[in-house]
């Protein structure tokens, strides 16, 4: 079944025919437009406070616009065609960066100038690798999050199960703990949803499945990938809830105590601790202790399948992109500010999902990592991460930026990563599979 589904996947690379506009924004040097991919209201409000401080310090006015991740390609294409690109695009995942690069919508010289001004050695090596294409610095990396497999440690311990870090252990746990009341595992399966691709890519990388090889040939029909599709299809068909699942239902089922495992990002950590009122855990035990799931959940980050040569972990590096039509000087000034004076406040918006990939300054190489560890997580209630999670979880977060793997980029085929954001062929295949 998986082989048949994989055979239907076609990745159409984004075209590179759109030439950068000659009409830059240099005459608008006191005003820039900034798009963000982070559209959660409280995060937008917090970012606007940082922007206000930037404007007060520099005199540069900023029009701040939120753009949903799943609509990014469409809106970007429309803006480019109309000659109305923003000056800066923030909170951009790697696929978004590559989409812009493939369509020649990026000012790589400006990005390189920012990295040079801040100090190349103040950034994590992996974050720079992921935001480069050969010698070209496509964007300026800012923070990273990791994909995790959350599991009910209390249920695992009671059943004598090993931590779910291998395909075999994940399947064994899903089979042992699946019941009419509790699903063995929940994970995204919705076609057309980037979260579905992120979920599957995490598991696929663990089994040595790559989307493309170094020659640019799509390899989703490889033995490793077919086995990965089979593995995921088996889990979702036999040990999960019925119907399609998305970012909200996966969280809701795990929070209700109706799933033994769930695949989600590090952004789940504050919510699982009961620190966000509109996303509170609802498990029976959570009524008396809202942090019950946080105290009784483990996390697995680096996973490995039977065909994988070494454990792998999916994650995302977010970046600031300076566009080809930008007012270069104020755009660079803005990005530099967001990675210096505004950086700690930026990370504080959601520390559980914003680990600093700029670790410090030339004078204090660990300044930002040290500050990050003291930040409080949560939305409606704030508390240190260490109040709810053991040091091993904190260590997973701090090491995540250096351990991340991604399809296509390490093979020098980053443009196909951007194309996959627009086409989302893998989520379509997952939808057909389950």
Region locations from a protein language model:
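Extracytoplasmic "Venus flytrap"/periplasmic binding protein-like
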Residues: 53-123, 154-165, 260-261, 271, ...
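C-terminal capping/gating helix-and-loop segments adjacent to ligand/active sites or protein-protein/ligand interfaces
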Residues: 132, 353-356, 373-434
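Extracytoplasmic/periplasmic substrate-recognition and gating elements
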Residues: 159, 238, 277-360
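Extracytoplasmic/periplasmic solute-binding protein
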Residues: 134-140, 171-217, 224, 251-252, ...
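Short, low-complexity disordered leader/linker segments with a strong preference
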Residues: 1-33, 56
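Short, well-ordered beta-strand elements
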Residues: 27-39, 60-65, 87-88, 138, ...
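Glycine-centered hinge/linker elements that transmit conformational signals in sensory
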Residues: 174, 215-243, 292, 297-298
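Hinge/lid segment of periplasmic solute-binding proteins
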Residues: 94-146, 196-199, 289-303
